[in-house]
Structures are given as structure tokens and as C-alpha cells.
From Swiss-Prot:
Species the sequence originates in: Borreliella burgdorferi (strain ATCC 35210 / DSM 4680 / CIP 102532 / B31) (Borrelia burgdorferi)
Pfam families: DEAD, Helicase_C, RecG_dom3_C, RecG_wedge
InterPro entries to which the protein is assigned, alphabetical: ATP-dep_DNA_helicase_RecG (IPR004609), DEAD/DEAH_box_helicase_dom (IPR011545), Helicase_ATP-bd (IPR014001), Helicase_C-like (IPR001650), NA-bd_OB-fold (IPR012340), P-loop_NTPase (IPR027417), RecG/Mfd (IPR047112), RecG_dom3_C (IPR045562)
Assigned protein family: Belongs to the helicase family. RecG subfamily.
Residue ranges constituting the Helicase C-terminal domain according to the UniProt record: 457-617
Keyword set includes Repeat: no
Protein name: ATP-dependent DNA helicase RecG
Amino acid sequence: MFLHEFEYELKGIGGLGEKGVERLNNLQIFNVKDLIEFFPVKYEDRQNIQTFPDFSKVKSCDMMTVFTVLGHKKFGDSSKKNLKLTVKSINEEPFEILLFNRAFLENVFKIDKKFYIYSKFTYNDYSGLWSCSNFDSEVYSDKPERFKKILPVYSLTEGLTSKKISLYVKEALEYFFKFGQTDIPRFLIEKYSLLSLSDALKEIHFPSSLEMLEKAKKTLIYREIFLLQFFSRYRSSKILFREKKDLSKDLLEKVVSSLPFELTEDQKISIDEIFFDLNSSKPMNRLLQGDVGSGKTLVALLSGLPLIEAGYQVAFMAPTDLLARQHYDNLSNILAPFNISMTLLTGSLRKKDKEQALESIRNGTSGLIVGTHAIFYESTEFKRLAYVIIDEQHKFGVVQREELKNKGEGVDMLLMSATPIPRSFALTLFGDLEVSFIKTLPKGRLPITTYLARHGNEDKVYEFLRKELLKGHQVYFVYPLISSSEKFELKDVNNMCLKLKEVFGEYVVDMLHSKLPSDLKEEIMKNFYSKKVDILVATSVIEVGIDCPNATCMVVEHAERFGLSTLHQIRGRVGRSNLQSFFFLLYKEPLTSAGKFRLKTIKENLDGFKIAEEDLRLRGPGNLFGLEQAGYLKLKIANFVDDREIIVLVREELDLFFYDNSAYDKLDIDLLDNLFCSYLNAGRSI
């Protein structure tokens, strides 16, 4: 049995009863597998006996020492809860240690007895004494139970100690060692000098030495990253091949030539990569990602033109009606001279318009379909669907994506991410995808200038904005709330829209938020694009997709309430032309350390990939990319940032394996085949 199959109940393990199981459940430990993979958060190195350091140089230290008790005395207020020990350590003069709230141990620390003790000791200059409150002690012996070892320290909850968890883990491991089997192929162990799975699990929980502990960590990191990538790659390797297409670039080249600007080198490379995949005998699965304003949407559109030219249909999915409408309008303008039939399909369409749209999709007269979730519906039938483009892919589930692909045969799929994803994370999360990166911005774009300002300096910001408005430019204001809340002392869209109408009386101010009807949101955005609205007050609903080249200023109030990637996305709504743009972050003090870090990072960095990496380090992948539902993202031991080199190595290893595994041992191939089958049989989603 593989480790992922050890989903047996915990009751009985190490004498666990219902109360103990409940406590482990509070730590998200629900079965034997979870318990085995509940790795320590740190370790106490009790291998070597130490003497107290020179207090003139060191005021605090974690250490294990040995001392003999020479005397003791209770002290403190009338309750006398504290204990003062006079002790003699190795080769040292007698000195005193304070044990806070430990007077009840007077009869344990008997005079002339020798003890091991491990604790965080702190030196107090005023009393001239070393003190500790939480410690572990044991009567001195040649074979101590908890000393002269490296002990694991686990995350805890009420009623549990690291010692108890160690006992439970020990019995769970014995069970696995008896009935389990490895899921690490030998070629990985030999090439990277890894431990066996059994040895790695034993050493991670009960290290025999610091050297073996590091080897165990390395092994389990490789294993976790390997399995993550292997499962998705294995699935894609079993995709049936199709007949190759012989696509032309004629229409693509005509449209590119008609553009009033030149594509960036990254855009050209991405289009070529996609074109190669579309012509191959294997359906494409590719992730297209780039920084804010890098031109991903244009690349996606252009890449579909060879298929439309050949008589196939292309579906372009957006997460909201507003964004779908914007894409439709922009693409219509680009394709107008080329007689390409387009259809918009959203849930907010009137019944008659929706019926017409569905009919044009069904009979094949529509080559490019832009829409929202409505494209997924059973009533939406395609005549010749060949290519699916999904914008903001994380907002659509795997099942939805597969349903859309199943509306055609051998359908190619391109996923786009609004948030730049660090390379190491993309290679792991999307192990079954090829990845195209667009890092360069279109020519002529100027770097956005970012300013930080404390609340109370609004008038200075308003004065700056007036100068931009006088030039005919437009402005955004973003707030964390739609309406006022009794829970939070935060500015909101409704009230600030009224105030800003007073402040900027000579200009047109309107607001946009998620609770407005779809048709009203579309009307407001049309007015903003046509410069009938000068100032748009909104929530973070504008963070993705809004594209108004004439808008040069963005003001975010209560900026400390927003995440790094969200702030970067919001900033990306300006700077979308050759006009100099400005980003104002108004924050309210006091700031948390994380809040200070976010604001400092966003001010000093314009690179979305760098910002995403810092956000990944801060918040983890689930929160950052909206992927909380994907349980496999909760890594047990690997780290997407710190272990990026291993991620790349494993990716390259799997490239070789899936390209030609004839050089690999049959035992390894059989192991991985069985592993994949057992994973599917266990009901896992991959």
C-alpha cells in the first residue's frame, strides 16, 4: 500500500481515544496518513551538554545543560509560586536559577540530585540571575529518555504535547513500515542521493543526527514535488493523439500588420509557441501568463486566427459579464476589417439575443465566441469547436474546463492568469501544461510612479489629481467597502462618491461595484471609456481587465487592507498608454509589520513576477491565486519559493521520463503506473 492509501482511523493508535482523536482533528489530522505527514515545525538539539554562556555577551539562549542542586527556596508574593535553585553546572562555580511558577517542583529538585534540563534561559541584568519558565528536565542517567537526542517540536493545540504526538507518530510509522511501500522511484533516489521513504519518514520525526535530518528533509521535498508534477504529467501523457492540422498564418499576419503598433518579442514568441502546438498531433494544454498590461489578451486572440481561418470555432471565456463585454468590444474593433463573425454569449443577454447567439454557435456561422459561464451550459452546442481560451483560469474549476473541452474533439486549451505566477510555482501547479511567459511591456509604456501617503494628506493628493484632470486625463479611486460598516472604520464607495463630487465639483464622478446590475455597469464603463466620466470610484472590482488608456491616476485608500497582488493588479489599470501614470497608496496608521512590508514592496517594485513571489512567500498559494479549494496546494514540507531549484530539476527529469522512458528500469515504470492507478482508485482529483 502507498502512503496516500493509509487513510485509516486514528482511534487506537498509541492508545488514542475519542478525546485524543478530536484534539488531533483540530490540527487537521484525520487519519494515519495525516499523522505520518504531520511533520515537526522545529527541533530541539539536545545532543550536547552545554555550559551557561558569558552573560555579558549573551542574554538569551536555548540550551541543554546538566547541574547538581545545592539548595532551593520559594519566593514571590504571598503565594510563593516561584522557585530559586542554587545549582552547580559542569566546571562552574555555584549560581542561582529562577524557575517561574514552578514552586511545586521543590520536592522534585532534591538537594544533591543531578539533572538534565533543556530550556530557553534568559539573563536578567537587574537580578543578576538566569531564569526560565518552560523547561524539560530529567534525572541524570547514562541512558536518558529525552536527552542526548534531537527531539521534534510539533504544532500543538490544547491537550496535546510534542511528547504525546511523538508517541502517536511512532506507532503510526510502525504500522506503515509493516504494510506500506515506497512511492519514490529508484532513479530519483540514486541520482539525487536520497533516502528510502521509510528512512526519510523515520529521520524526519526521530532524527539520529543533524546530517540525517537534512537528508530526510531533502528526500521528502523531492518526493512531494515529484509526485505533484508526476500525477498531472502522467494524465496528460495518456491523452489520445489526433490528426495533425495544416494551419495557415495568412489571416494572422494580415491582422498583425493592421495593428497600429508592433508586437513585443515575448508576444511574438508566445504566438509561435501556441501555433506550433495547434498544428501538433497532441491537443494543446498551455498556460499563457504575463505581467499586467503585457498584452496577453491580444496574444490569445491572434493565436486563434489560424483556426478561425480554417473554419473552426474558438471560444474565449471571461469570468464576468463586464470583462466579456470589454473583450468582445475590443476584439470587434480589431477584427472589423476582416469579415470574421463574432458572438457574445453571457447570462445577462436578453432572451432573443441569447437565442440568436446560440443558433449562430450551433450552425457554425460564428467563428469567435466570447462569453462567460454561459458557454459551459448544456444548451450551448458548437458545430466545430477546436480551441478554448480561458481568461483568469483560477476562477473556473477543472470540471468546468473539461466540460468545455468535451464540446469538441481534440480541443486545444489556453489558460491565462491575471496574476503573474512565479515560475517555480507555475511549473509545479501546472505540471501538465507548457508555459509561455510575456515579461516585456509594449513599446512606449512609461514606468508608473508610486507614492505612499498617510491618511490626512488627501488634500495634497487631490491637488495633484486636479493637474491631471486639467490635461483631460481620468482618475480612479478604490475603496475596500461598498457601503459603510459598523464593524470597520473604513471609507466606502457610496459615501466617498458623494464627497468626491463635492471636492471635484466641475468634473463628472460616477461609481462602480459588484452589486450594480450588469447593464448599468456596462453603461458606466462605456461612459468612462468615452470620457463622459472623469472620475470613477470603485471597489477592487476594477482590478482585472479594465483598459482605459486615458486614465493616468489611481488612488487606493486604506491600501493597508489590500494584498500585494491585488494592489499590483489595481495599479495595472493605469499606465496603459504612452502617458505618464501615477499610483497613490493612502494608508492609515498604525501599520502591522506585514502591512509595512506590502506597501514597501509595491512602492519599490514594478515587476509583477517579483511581487507575486513575495506575496507567495507571505500568504501561500491558496490565498494568492484563489486556489484554496485545491487541497494539494497545502504542501507538507516543500516550499514554492525556497525549493525552486528542486522544482526545475524535477520538471527536467520528468521531461526526460515522459519523452522516452525506455532507459528507465521496468521496476520504476511499474511502480509509477501502479501509483497513478491507486491514486485514481482512491478517488483523488488530479
